[in-house]
């Protein structure tokens, strides 16, 4: 791949300004449309990487990741009950490093049924060592009609700051479009990469119209 092709691909993904800013040592931030709050566009995912035991050989590198995230003016860390021990590890390490309050913590509900969803989410609060979670999302749209009612209530009461939905397959885009059209959401996490760009055509304009931040999750 030559330089021209590389720059074209970065521009198509909206990453060229980010790369330019990194070279100039500037901190780029993007606005959450529903609130005006600003976040850095790059965060830390925890699938597999934070699913570790108590061995210091596994945990020490992750402490370095959290330190670097904060040192570089980042804050977003994304997890899920689906990710094994990741929530527990994030909670323990960030507390040990006195960084928990500096993180923008996002996690998800990944189960069926109202009461089971409430139980699972409350467990996430405990594992992440938080009284308030920044972003709670419905993982892969699982039982989304039920969980969305709970999330709305929790947002109104201040238990969570933002709510959203996630998925990784283009086959769900029609359902996501209907959800966005009929339900106020703060965040949408969806697959988007050089190999999967349909979200830019179908979902991003609608998310922008409905003031939902597009939290793009590369698939490569």
Predicted feature descriptions by range:
Residues 118-137, 153, 157:
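CE4/NodB-like, metal-dependent polysaccharide N-deacetylase domain
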Residues 81, 97-116, 140:
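Structural motif corresponding to the early beta-alpha repeats
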Residues 29, 66, 87, 91, ...:
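Generic structural signal for well-ordered alpha-helices
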Residues 56-68, 114-127, 171-178:
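Short, acidic/polar
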Residues 45, 80-83, 136-139, 166, ...:
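Conserved residues at the C-terminal ends of beta-strands
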Residues 41-43, 76, 102-106, 132-135, ...:
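Structural preference for beta-strand elements that scaffold enzyme active sites
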Residues 2-103:
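N-terminal binding-site loop/beta-alpha segment at the start of enzyme catalytic domains
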Residues 141-220:
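Beta/alpha (TIM)-barrel catalytic core signal, keyed to glycine-rich beta->alpha loops juxtaposed to Asp/Glu
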């Amino acid at each position: 791949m030559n330089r021209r092709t590389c720059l074209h691909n970065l521009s198509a993904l909206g990453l060229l300004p980010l790369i330019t800013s990194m070279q100039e040592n500037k901190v780029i931030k993007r606005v959450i449309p529903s609130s005006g709050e600003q976040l850095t566009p790059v965060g830390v995912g925890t699938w597999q990487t934070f699913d570790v035991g108590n061995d210091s050989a596994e945990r020490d590198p992750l402490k370095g990741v959290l330190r670097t995230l904060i040192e570089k003016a980042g804050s977003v860390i994304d997890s899920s009950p689906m990710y094994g021990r990741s929530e527990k590890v994030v909670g323990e390490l960030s507390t040990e490093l006195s960084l928990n309050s500096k993180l923008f913590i996002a996690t998800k509900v990944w189960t069926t049924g109202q009461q089971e969803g409430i139980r699972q989410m409350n467990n996430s609060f405990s594992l992440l060592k938080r009284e308030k979670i920044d972003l709670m999302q419905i993982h892969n749209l699982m039982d989304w009609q039920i969980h969305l009612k709970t999330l709305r209530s929790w947002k109104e009461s201040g238990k969570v700051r933002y709510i959203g939905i996630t998925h990784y397959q283009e086959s769900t885009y029609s359902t996501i479009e209907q959800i966005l059209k009929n339900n106020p959401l703060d965040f949408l996490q969806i697959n988007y990469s050089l190999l999967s760009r349909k979200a830019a055509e179908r979902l991003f304009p609608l998310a922008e119209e409905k003031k939902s931040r597009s939290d793009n999750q590369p698939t490569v």
